Amino acid sequence: MPLRIAAAVAVVAFSGVSSDAYAENWPQWRGPSANGISPETNLPVTWSTTENIAWKLPLPAWSGSTPIVWGDRIFLNVSENGGIHLWAIDRAKGEPLWKRHLSDGDTKMRKQNMSTPSPVTDGTGVWVMTGTGILKAFDFNGKELWARDIQKEYGPFGLNWGYGSSPMLFGDSLFVQVLHGMKTDDPSYVLRISKANGRTIWRVERPTIAQRESPDSYTTPAIVRHGKSLELVITGGDAVTGHDVNTGKELWRADSLNPTNDFAYRIVASPVVHGELIIAPSRERPMLAMRPGGRGDVANSHIVWSFQNGPDVPTPVTDGTYVYVINDRGIMWCLDAKTGKEVYGKMRLRPSTYSGSFALADGKLYITNEDGLTTVLRAGPTFEILAENNFDDYTLSSPAVSDGQIFIRTASALWAIGKPRSK
C-alpha cells in the first residue's frame, strides 16, 4: 500500500476527506498518516539562514509544538505575553492572518511552556489544546466554534513536567489522553470528543501499575486498523493498551514498558503505526513491536520483537521495511521492521540533545536537534548523511513537510524551506 494511504485510508473512510488532501498536507503532529511519513518528493536537501529559504517569520518564544499545514494556511501554538495563542499564518507570505487567545498562563518548566501540544486540522476546522487544559475549535477564519476546560471538568493535571500530549484527530473525533500520577492521585483517562460540537462521546479511565513519575505520559495516541475494526493505541504508565474506538473499552494490554519497575520511567516518545505494525517506545528500554487484535493480557502473545535501546524523547518512524530510531543523545539505529534486528546501529549524529522527531519523505530522513541543526539522511539500509543544515537556534519541535517545502520552528522564527509559493 502506498505510504500516503498507509494510515490515511481509515481516516478517509471515517471522515470523507480524500487521501490526496491529507497526503499533500501536514495536518497534525506526525503528519498526514500520523506516523511521521509524507509522500512528498523533490524536497530540499541543503539550506542555510540565507539560502533556499522562502521566508522567515519571527516568533516570540520557543515551543515544542510543531507547525501544522493545510493548503495556504499554517497553524502554530504560541506562548506570548503570559498566555497561549493560536496563530494562523499565510503560507505564501509568511505573515500572520489572525491570532486567537487560548489561555492565560505560560508556566515555564524546562522544555515546557504550556504551548507544547500541536494543533490538528481537517482543512475546514482547526482544534488546539494547551498545557493548561484548554481545548478550543476554530474555523479557518478564526471564528471560535466551541471551547472546553479539561482541568476544570476532570481535575488538575498531575504530570511532573506539565501536560504535553497533542490531540489525535481521526474522522469526526478528537482523542485526548491525560496520563498522569506524579502530582496527583486522580486516575488517568482517555476522551473521545466530537470535533463538531466539543461534546464527550466517551471517557474511560486507564488504570496503571506504575508508581511515582512512571504514570506520566507525554505521548500522543495512534490508530491501528485490524481487519474491519479500529483500535486506539495508548502508551504510558508502563503499559501499551489497545481500545475500541467506538466505546473506549480496553481490549488488550501489555504491562511491558518498564520491566525493572523504575519509579521515574515517564514516557515521551509516542506509539507509531504502519499497517498492522505497532512500535511502542519507552524511556530507555525496551522498545516493543506489537500486532493488534489481542484480548486481555497480550504480553506473551502479541509482542513481535523487543529492542533494548529506546529513544527516550524522539518518536521513531517506520516505513514497514525499516524502523529508524534516534535517542535524545543523537545515537541512531536502523532496524529490520519484521524482526527487530539491527541493520545498522549506534551511529552518532552531531553531538547535541535531540527532542524533535523524524520526518520521513522523498527517500530521506529529517531530524533537527536542540541547537537548530537538521541532519538529512538517506533512508534505507546504509547509514549516509546527505547534509547538515544549521539555523543555530534553540529548537524543540519536529520538521513538517508539505507540497515541496519543509517547515522548521526554532525559538526565534518559523522557517519555510524551499521554493517560494506564488502570493
Can you say where each PLM-predicted feature lies in the sequence?
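N-terminal secretory signal peptides that target proteins for export/translocation
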Residues: 1-2
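Bacterial N-terminal signal peptides
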Residues: 6-17
